[in-house]
Amino acid sequence: TYLALLAGVAVDAGLIRDVNEPVVARLPGIGFDSPHNAPITWQHLLQQTSEWEGSLFGVPDQVDRYRTVQYQPKAAQGRKGDPRPLQAPGSFWEYNDVRINQLSFALMHLFRRPLPEVFAEAITRPIGASDQWRWVGYDNAWVEVDGRRMQSVPGGTHWGGGVSIDSV
């Protein structure tokens, strides 16, 4: 995904020194401070095994628990959105858009810049891609980072927003 590419850019820039480092070590105060979330690493977020618990911009992670997608390792054991006991971070795979969006939120805080800017500078411009693409966030996903107001963008398009890019 675009977020995996940007995580690679962060590794290359030295912003992520070790994908096994807990996210909270560099980014306290953005949703990784609880006893359950504190052990979550960049690798867990990227591999969708974080089991991150919380709400992001008013959407709780529970809405995507037990979500079924074609390529998942095994069938969901409940109905989408039902409560499910959380496992230890890194021990359970589940596709969850809120958790993907939390990865995006964390990367934005790590770069201290809007991700569309970083994506253009590090990915699309260097490869000569068209600038006719958009990465749109949700209306309520505005935050202030270092005195600059910026929009956190989603990693997917499940609830609108996301990346629109031409393949030509």
Model-derived features: positions:
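Short, conserved acidic/polar surface loops in the N-terminal third of protein domains
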Residues: L6, P35, L56-G58
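Active-site-flanking alpha-helical
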Residues: L6-A7, F119
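Active-site helix/loop module of the DD-peptidase/beta-lactamase fold
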Residues: A13-E53, D82, H109-G161
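Catalytic-site signature segments of enzymes, centered on catalytic residues
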Residues: T1, L56-N140, G156, G162-V163
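A structural signal for well-ordered alpha-helical segments within the folded catalytic domains
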Residues: T1-L5, E21, I40-Q43, D97-N101, ...
